[in-house]
């Protein structure tokens, strides 16, 4: 009898413990799980929208080029049509940005950095359509812009949209989903999941709040974004340069010299971007008519340039494999480099919706290939392959300009599938970053954000000053 009683009591104790465990589980904070679920949703949406953006931009470009092919035998029609088509497409992008969502202009990455610090608003309901359609216009016009900036900003805004749809109010969720969307956006633009994660950790390190949930959320979003991208585009590297040879140890000093060159070029490039922005601001003075006409002229110029020298127009993804293969002479590489520096400054600094990553990668490829070809002539005993310097140069300019060497290294290796070049990449990017910092260069996106915040404060001060006296008393 005592045994039965003891058994019964033991069973009751087990049941009570189970009930207590279930009760504790039910009462536990579900916020981390909810954030991870929403991160998966954000990553999936960003991947879908990123692929859609890529496809629609390609469609617009093909339609424009197809129209030009129809009149290719009639020069008196071809040149004016090339200018008009690109000008009209560009004007659509400039008008939408200026009229409906000024924060959608430019890359959009500084806006996300500002939003992570809660210094810039996130108005996803107007940024998403304007950035998508405006980017279709400017990139479809053949302007020297990349799609990574728009995709990062679109991803961040999708993160805020999902947050609002699920009515989450916690600051942690707001910050985490914004960062998740941005990382997923970069991953969707370049098929580079690890670079997307590093971009948030490295480039946005002052704004990103490190904790276990935020890191897991970023990983989750990037995974989903990459899966969606690969479902639609396959698993091949986004830039096909083939398998390049390894860099022998006795040639590594050349990569350090290349890094020193880019360490000088990066700060100069950043300074030119900022000065060109000031020049455009003085020209249009915020007047929408002047701004749109200016954008149309720049777009039309890119359309004409695409006929004269196709390598000098467009984002640069088509140019990179051709240049890296050594199909141009050193003189032509330097000429295209200078031409694309000018067109990049005109397109990006004018405030067109579009990124600068892809143009910078193309510029790095051009200068890196030129250096590699010159080094091969000067040091024939090394049997150098110019393509390896092209790969190193791709990441070096980004490292010196954006001050994100890890992201630059991993991004280029993921895009080209040449992981054996990681050592020369590290040497080149580290040399470029250290010299750029020594010369006093500032990270491009951080500088643009600081200028945006200064302008925002000045506008707010002007509003307060112009407020009726009755409101101030």
Swiss-Prot record:
Single GO cellular component annotation?
Answer: plasma membrane
Q: Which residues lie in the membrane yet do not traverse it?
A: 109-116, 177-189, 193-201, 387-401, 402-404, 405-416, 417-421
- Just give the chief location class: membrane
Coiled coil residues, start to end:
none
Q: Coordinates of motif Selectivity filter part_1 in the sequence?
A: 106-110
- Positions that bind chloride: 107, 356-357, 445
Question: Which Cys-Cys disulfides exist here?
Answer: none
Site entry: Mediates proton transfer from the outer aqueous phase to the interior of the protein: 148
Site location (Mediates proton transfer from the protein to the inner aqueous phase) = 203
Q: Does the keyword Manganese apply?
A: no
Query: Which Gene3D superfamilies does this UniProt record tie to the protein?
Result: Clc chloride channel
One Pfam family, short name please? Voltage_CLC
Q: How does it assemble?
A: Homodimer.
Q: What is this protein called?
A: H(+)/Cl(-) exchange transporter ClcA
- Lineage in the entry? Bacteria, Pseudomonadati, Pseudomonadota, Gammaproteobacteria, Enterobacterales
